[in-house]
UniProtKB/Swiss-Prot annotation:
Its EC number is 2.7.7.6. The gene is rpoA. Residues 251-331 are annotated as: Alpha C-terminal domain (alpha-CTD). This is DNA-directed RNA polymerase subunit alpha. The lineage of its organism: Bacteria, Pseudomonadati, Pseudomonadota, Gammaproteobacteria, Enterobacterales. GO terms for molecular function: DNA binding; DNA-directed RNA polymerase activity; protein dimerization activity. DNA-dependent RNA polymerase catalyzes the transcription of DNA into RNA using the four ribonucleoside triphosphates as substrates. It comes from Buchnera aphidicola subsp. Baizongia pistaciae (strain Bp).
C-alpha cells in the first residue's frame, strides 16, 4: 500500500508517428491521473514561446519609404509583401544576424528561391511566394535583415531602440518577428489502463514546424528546458540570509570600568581595593552600611564615593543580575 502512494508511474514512449518531415505525432503512457494535462500544457507553452529561430526583422525596398506605399509593376502592396516575407523559413549556421538580397526584373512570380544568400544560410520553403511582377519593365530590389530570437517580438517592443537611432532607420520597413519554428502544437489526454488501474492518462502530442527544426528535436529541447527550470526545486534549500540580531550589552559599559577611573582620593581607593572592589560594577552593588564596615573608610570617604557615582547617574545598593560578566577577570 505504501509503494502505491509514494511511487509514481514513469511513462514510456509508446509511439512516434512521422506524418511528414515537419509533422509528428507522439504518444506517451501511462501517466498518473492529471499528469497528462500538467505535462502537455507545460510542453505546449514552451514549444510555442521558447524555441529559438530566425526571422525577418527589417526590409529595405528600393523606392519605398513606408509600408503604406505601392510599387509600380508589382501586384501586391508593400504590407502584403512584408507579410509574405514573414513566412520565410530560414536556417542560419554560426551567426545571429545576416543580410539577404533580392533583385528581380520582368514578368513573373518572385519566390524565396530568388533570394541571394551565402553558404551559411538555408531557406527551407524555396517556393514561398513573395510578390508578383506584372510587366516587362517591372523590377524589385530589396535588402532583408534576418535575426535570431525567441518567441514573437512585435515592432512596438523595439520602439525604444528605434527612437534612439532614428537616422539609422530611415527607409527601413520594420517587421513583427515570429522567431518560433513551431507552427502548431496540440495535445490531447486520453484514458489509459495498467493492469487493474483504469484512471490513468495517455498524452498524445501532435506538432508541426516550419522545417527549420526537426519536430522530435523540438520536443527534446522543450523537455530539457522544463527539466532545467525545475531542477532548482529538487535541491531546494533556504537561501535567505539569517537575521542578525544586534547584541545589546548586558551591562552599561561604565560598570565594566575599574574603580580607578572614578579618580577617588588615595585613601578611598585603597580601602576599596582592600575589599577586592576592582570594578565600578562591584562598587555600586555595595550598600552604605557595607562600605562603612570597611576598615579606614569613614563617612567622608562614603560621601565622596556617593557624589562621584551620582555624577555618573549611578548609586550604591544597585542590583546587577548575572554579575560579574564572563569577560571580566578578577584581579
Amino acid at each position: 500500500m505504501q509503494s502505491s502512494v509514494t511511487e509514481f508511474l514513469i511513462p514510456r514512449l509508446v509511439n512516434i508517428e512521422q506524418i511528414s518531415m515537419t509533422h509528428v505525432k507522439i504518444t506517451l503512457e501511462p501517466l498518473e491521473r492529471g499528469f497528462g494535462h500538467t505535462l502537455g500544457n507545460a510542453l505546449r507553452r514552451i514549444l510555442l514561446s521558447s524555441m529559438p529561430g530566425f526571422a525577418v526583422t527589417e526590409v529595405e525596398i528600393d523606392g519605398i519609404l513606408h509600408e503604406y506605399s505601392t510599387k509600380e509593376g508589382v501586384q501586391e502592396d508593400i504590407i502584403e509583401i512584408l507579410l509574405n516575407l514573414k513566412g520565410l523559413a530560414i536556417r542560419v549556421y554560426g551567426k545571429d544576424q545576416v543580410y539577404l538580397t533580392l533583385v528581380k526584373t520582368g514578368i513573373g512570380v518572385v519566390t524565396a528561391a530568388d533570394i541571394n544568400h551565402g553558404n551559411d544560410v538555408e531557406i527551407i520553403n524555396l517556393d514561398h511566394i513573395i510578390c508578383t511582377l506584372t510587366c516587362k519593365n517591372a523590377s524589385i530590389s530589396m535588402r532583408i535583415k534576418v535575426q535570431c530570437g525567441r518567441g514573437y517580438v512585435p515592432v512596438i517592443s523595439r520602439t525604444n531602440v528605434i527612437s534612439d537611432n532614428k537616422e539609422n532607420y530611415v527607409g527601413k520597413l520594420l517587421v513583427d518577428a515570429c522567431y518560433s519554428p513551431v507552427e502548431r502544437m496540440i495535445y490531447k489526454v486520453e484514458a489509459a489502463r495498467v493492469e487493474k488501474r483504469t484512471d490513468l492518462d495517455k498524452l498524445v502530442i501532435e506538432m508541426e514546424t516550419n522545417g527549420t527544426l526537426d519536430p522530435e528535436e523540438a520536443i527534446r529541447r522543450a523537455a530539457t528546458i522544463l527539466s532545467n527550470q525545475l531542477e532548482s526545486f529538487v535541491y531546494l534549500r533556504d537561501i535567505r540570509e539569517p537575521e542578525i540580531k544586534e547584541e545589546k550589552p548586558e551591562f552599561d559599559p561604565i560598570l565594566l570600568r575599574p574603580v580607578d577611573d572614578l579618580e577617588l582620593t588615595v585613601r578611598s581607593a585603597n580601602c576599596l581595593k582592600a575589599e577586592m572592589i576592582h570594578y565600578i560594577g562591584d562598587l555600586v552593588q555595595k550598600t552604605e552600611v557595607e562600605l562603612l564596615r570597611t576598615p579606614n573608610l569613614g563617612k567622608k570617604s562614603l560621601t565622596e564615593i556617593k557624589d562621584v557615582l551620582a555624577a555618573k547617574n549611578l548609586s550604591l545598593g544597585m542590583n546587577l543580575e548575572n554579575w560579574p560578566p564572563d569577560n571580566i577577570l578578577d584581579n
